[in-house]
From Swiss-Prot:
Major place of residence: membrane
One GO process term, biological-process aspect: phosphatidylethanolamine biosynthetic process
Location(s), subcellular: Cell membrane
Full protein name: Phosphatidylserine decarboxylase proenzyme
Keywords: Cell membrane, Decarboxylase, Lipid biosynthesis, Lipid metabolism, Lyase, Membrane, Phospholipid biosynthesis, Phospholipid metabolism, Pyruvate, Zymogen
UniProt site positions, description: Cleavage (non-hydrolytic): 260-261
Organism: Mannheimia succiniciproducens (strain KCTC 0769BP / MBEL55E)
One GO CC term, this protein: plasma membrane
EC number per UniProt: 4.1.1.65
Residue numbers of Pyruvic acid (Ser) PTMs: 261
Record-level Gene Ontology MF annotations: phosphatidylserine decarboxylase activity
Top enzyme class: lyase
Length: 294
């Protein structure tokens, strides 16, 4: 962080950064998860209504648009959308965006470095938990990082047809991943808890990473269910062959966050060309074009 950046940080902002390091991340996340799963009837519906109002959640596109349709806060948070709310681009040479949100960063992986925020990079090897094979596959490739805010739809979809080959759960920190902290906490995305999913696709190997954050109670995939909790502190790896290797179609749901976070996509060198319109803060919607086959 240079001296100019330091001068621009207010005292209140410094406290926000310090709080991220000092707070009991796991305990807060466990407490939030417990409350979010409680069935409290009218109280739950009131909390959902206040949350939707505060964050301007667009309920008209939800499959269940009434607050009273949700028995728990988590049911609301991972709400499904109406059937045609997110049309999937059908161009067979194009990949589609996996999540609603905003582009945090995107572009070329410079050797083994990805851009986290302006002036701040982090290591591909660290992001992939030191996995040598994956690091080699995606070195000098392309990446897209999508931030999901509290108001966004929190189910994650497939950019293209793919077959799961490997999944790695990486324990880690639970820093908030909002844009301010993403700029001021070094290596944040490579330090946070995450689930790394490697797929075989018609575009070559693709990684889709679901990154946890403060009060992200759980991350789930459609083929394994809830990955965390438990949080044992150990890296866990799944490999898939034969009938255990689930295939998913372009646009199909592949996972979800119970309280939100970030999705990172990785592509090998010379595999895809990212869509020209993608840049920092571009609003994303599931099904819109992410990249084209080279």
């Amino acid at each position: 962080m240079n001296s100019l950046e330091k001068k621009q940080i207010t005292y209140g902002q410094r406290l926000k950064i310090a709080f991220q390091y000092a707070m009991p991340q796991i305990y807060l996340t466990q407490i939030a998860g417990w409350f979010a799963n409680k069935r409290w009837g009218a109280v739950t519906h009131f909390v959902i209504k206040m949350f939707a109002k505060k964050y301007n959640v667009h309920m008209a596109e939800a499959a269940k648009p009434n607050f009273s349709d949700y028995a728990t806060f988590n049911e609301f948070f991972i709400r499904q959308l109406k059937e045609y709310a997110r049309p999937i681009n059908q161009n067979t040479d194009a990949l589609c965006l996996p999540a609603d949100g905003k582009i945090s960063q995107c572009g070329h992986i410079d050797d083994e470095l990805l851009l986290q925020a302006k002036g701040h990079s982090f290591s591909l090897r660290d992001l992939l938990a030191g996995d040598e094979e994956l690091t080699r596959l995606f070195k000098d490739g392309e990446f897209v990082t999508t931030y999901l805010s509290p108001r966004d739809y929190h189910r994650v979809h497939m950019p293209c047809n793919g077959t799961i080959r490997k999944m790695i759960y990486v324990p880690g920190e639970l820093f908030s991943v909002n844009p301010f902290l993403n700029t001021h906490i070094p290596n944040l995305l490579a330090r946070n808890e995450r689930v790394i999913c490697l797929f075989d696709t018609d575009f070559g190997p693709m990684v889709q990473i679901l990154v946890g954050a403060t009060i992200t109670a759980s991350i789930s995939t459609v083929w394994e269910g809830v990955i965390n909790p438990p949080r044992t502190g150990d890296i866990r790896t799944w490999t898939y062959e034969g009938q255990s290797a689930v295939s998913l179609a372009k646009g199909q749901e592949m996972g979800a966050f119970q309280l939100g976070s970030t999705v990172i996509n990785l592509f090998p060198k010379n595999a895809v060309k990212l869509a020209d319109y993608l840049q920092v803060d571009t609003v994303t919607r599931v099904g819109e074009i992410l990249a084209y086959k080279k």
